[in-house]
Amino acid sequence: MVKNKKTIQFIGVDCILMVILTLLDQWTKSLVVHHLKDQSDIILIPGVFQLHYLENRGAAFGILQNQRIIFVILTIIYLAAVFWFLHRCPKNGRYTLLHIIASVLTAGALGNFIDRLRLGYVVDFFYFSLINFPVFNVADIFVVISFIGIAVSILFIYKDDEFEFLSIRKKESKA
């Protein structure tokens, strides 16, 4: 019973974090649509950073333009994979970071997925004009932070054997 209670607590926190972050992403996009669509950019730091409304029908750096069905399929596959991961991931303090990373990454995927389903494109609005960096949004920030977290976790925090929970094969008994 204690294990089930801990599992429910971890999954509950994972889901709450996903929902809060997805709502934050959608709220920022709603503000941008309301205040920036068909308007001039809002310059925050002249020559460096501004808010710029953009309807992105592709992926990062403009690849895969107008391939909505591909993004929908990939997001569904990703969501199935992350829920499998969260189901398999140990529910203890040692793995809290992985739960957080998976939840933040999922919020990023869901935020852009909702845009694609609802609008047919993703609303982007952060623009670093100084380096002409592609316009991005809060969900994109969640994805990037998550991938950095994954890299740091793999390289510096967890040992290889701590990822055995991801193995599909059954452990051989040491008899």
PLM-predicted stretches and their roles:
Residues 1-175:
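Alpha-helical transmembrane bundles and membrane-interface segments of multipass inner-membrane proteins
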